Every structure is written in C-alpha cells, then in structure tokens.
Amino acid sequence: MDYLKILLEDSSLAADFDALFDFFLLDEPTERDEVEGRCTFSLDGKAFARDGAGGEYHQLEDGSIGYVSSEGQCGRIAESIDDLIHLLVYSICWHDYCDSSQYTDMGTLEAYANERHDEIASYTEMDIWEEVVKALGMPSEANVAVELQKFYDAAHREPLYQGFYHEEDGSITPY
C-alpha cells in the first residue's frame, strides 16, 4: 500500500500521524543533512521525513530505510516503506525498543514487546491511534515482536548503513 501517498494527500491524517509517531513527512525527497558537507554515508539515499528532535529518515538506494538521529546514531531500520510504517504504527515509540539484549529469541522478544507496548499504550492517545490505523487500511492487531524482529534484521543486514563525520583534522569518525 502507498502509505506515504495517503499521508501526503490528507494533511489532517498526516498531522495525527506526526503527533503519534513523531514522523513529519517532507513534501518531496531532499538531500540528507550532511552538516555542511562534513558527513558522508555508506549508502546513497534521500531524506523523506524528519522527527521532532532533528533526526532524519532516508530512503536508501536499495529501497530500504535508514535513520540518522540528531545525536549521531545511524543505521538501517526497515527494508521498505511498508515495513517502516508497520514499525512506527505497531511499536509506536520504536526508539524505546532498542535494547538488543531482548532480541535473543522470539519468546524473550515477545515478552519485551508486550511489556513495552502496554506501557507506551498507557500514555498514548489510542483513540487517535485507532483512527490512523483505520485510515491507513491497516489491521488494528499485530504481533509487535514480529515487526521488531524485522527491524532488528534490517539493522544488522550487510552492508550496514553508517554515517561518517569528517573531523577538522582530517580524521573520520564513524557513527
């Protein structure tokens, strides 16, 4: 499904989506923020969305999705736009699911996912969440652990999506 098209065509839905998931869709793909030419990346891509803290979502040359946080963390987070939207919608605050020690097996991941989801849902406007899910034509129930496993697999797939900061002294710092 073309979720981005749906969001671009419905500004009210896009505003609700941004409020719930901290995901502001750009009007069109743009060059990535390269900090005045001092940052380079391991894969080509374009920025297509931002979050409220200054992070960027990048569609990479192979169609997968990368993310660069304002703190300098960089990596692939989804294999496709559809996988990204599922990650955002079903894990709500995907940044809160990054404890790699919880991804050892599906049982551990399911317990972690359920615990985090219940906590996040307790302070999320779930009535608006339901409206957004319905407007996007997505099921209201999903196995969060399955979505998180796809996230983990994308993040660890080679080649890794990395950023590099070019220091004034000529050295390069990966992030």
Report the location of each language-model feature.
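A surface-exposed partner-binding patch
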Residues: M1-G72, Y103, I120-Y175
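Compact, glycine/acidic-enriched structural inserts
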Residues: E71-G107
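Short, surface-exposed, charge-dense and proline/glycine-enriched linear segments
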Residues: V89-I92, T108-A113, E125-G137
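Hydrophobic alpha-helical interaction segments
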Residues: D99, Y103-A121
